UniProtKB/Swiss-Prot annotation:
Gene giving rise to this polypeptide: BRCC3
Modified residues (N-acetylalanine): 2
Protein name according to UniProt: Lys-63-specific deubiquitinase BRCC36
UniProt keyword Zinc present: yes
Molecular function in Gene Ontology: cysteine-type deubiquitinase activity; enzyme regulator activity; K63-linked deubiquitinase activity; metal ion binding; metal-dependent deubiquitinase activity; metallopeptidase activity; polyubiquitin modification-dependent protein binding
Top-tier EC class: hydrolase
MPN domain sequence ranges: 12-179
Motif (JAMM motif): 122-135
Recorded family membership: Belongs to the peptidase M67A family. BRCC36 subfamily.
EC number: 3.4.19.-
Tissue expression summary: Heart, brain, placenta, lung, liver, skeletal muscle, kidney and pancreas. Aberrantly expressed in the vast majority of breast tumors.
Pfam entry (one): BRCC36_C
Length: 316
């Protein structure tokens, strides 16, 4: 028997430039999870016929009649600095949430749109895309403050056993009170596919939550927005700051001998060089290629302008 689930959010529209920043952030660290916050707005689109679940290439009509479809639009993301690196867990401090809210207010003034923190994202390196019971409980806590709050997970560094090629899976979910019985509707999404999935998490009876996947649609953009560009450029700085913080904490210990300190310094230098090779170098090359492309496009527009001006002068 199917369980009727009332969703606070029916779909998520993620801008392609924000998606690019999330993907680069997730692929920047293979051993620990990374995290960030999503900035956007929540729109209520009135529908008189059916509820639509949006996917990357199609639109499916659900037989349930609704009055309004609540869609979360994610325009940009904020990369968070990790104070504690863990392989299987990430945490967002109240100070980071407050700083993100301040940034959202600044963006609202610049764009004239009701920007706010609408969700969070984190990575799952080498593990499944589905949220853990800790992720589901954390998401439920955020939804107590905002029912429209969503969570995104990027599963990376996954190798297909048949083709031996890497894959990146992603999902968007919310938490709801667990039902006595539920059933899975679809499977995970591999890049541009979409699905809806429900499963009960093994928690205490009085605290049980289940995840429900929210259909997500990547909105294509020809250009990258200024805010997302700033976030992409900020990524190497944040990774460097995290390495410096970790090195300073270890270096401040008084019981370390000279050999250990030299070893720690070598590891710190090695990590910085690895980041330059894996993150900073490709990012710089991408920015240079983008600049060259923009300059070429500018020349084409200037040439087109001159041709139009000549045609206009000939008509006069």
């Amino acid at each position: 028997m199917a369980v009727q689930v009332v969703q606070a959010v029916q779909a998520v529209h993620l801008e392609s430039d924000a998606f690019l920043v999330c993907l680069n952030h997730a692929l920047s660290t293979e051993k620990e999870e990374v995290m960030g916050l999503c900035i956007g707005e929540l729109n209520d689109d009135t529908r008189s016929d059916s509820k639509f679940a949006y996917t990357g290439t199609e639109m499916r009509t659900v037989a349930e009649k609704v009055d309004a479809v609540r869609i979360v639009h994610i325009h940009s993301v904020i990369i968070l600095r990790r104070s504690d690196k863990r392989k299987d867990r990430v945490e967002i401090s109240p100070e980071q949430l407050s700083a993100a809210s301040t940034e959202a207010e600044r963006l609202a003034e610049l764009t004239g749109r009701p920007m706010r923190v609408v969700g969070w994202y984190h990575s799952h390196p080498h593990i499944t895309v589905w949220p853990s019971h800790v992720d589901v409980r954390t998401q439920a806590m955020y939804q107590m403050m905002d029912q429209g709050f969503v969570g995104l997970i990027f599963s990376c560094f996954i190798e297909d056993k048949n083709t031996k090629t890497g894959r990146v899976l992603y999902t968007c979910f919310q938490s709801i009170q667990a039902q006595k019985s539920s059933e899975s509707l679809h499977g995970p999404r591999d890049f541009w596919s979409s699905s809806q999935h429900i499963s009960i998490e093994g928690q205490k009876e009085e605290e049980r939550y289940e995840r429900i996947e929210i259909p997500i649609h990547i909105v294509p953009h020809v250009t990258i927005g200024k805010v997302c560009l700033e976030s992409a450029v900020e990524l190497p700085k944040i990774l460097c700051q995290e390495e410096q913080d970790a090195y300073r904490r270890i270096h401040s210990l008084t019981h370390l001998d000279s050999v250990t300190k030299i070893h720690n310094g070598s590891v710190f230098t090695k990590n910085l060089c690895s980041q330059m090779s894996a993150v900073s170098g490709p990012l710089l090359q991408w920015l240079e290629d983008r600049l060259e492309q923009n300059q070429q496009h500018l020349q084409e527009l200037q040439q087109e302008k001159e041709e139009l001006m000549q045609e206009l002068s000939s008509l006069e």
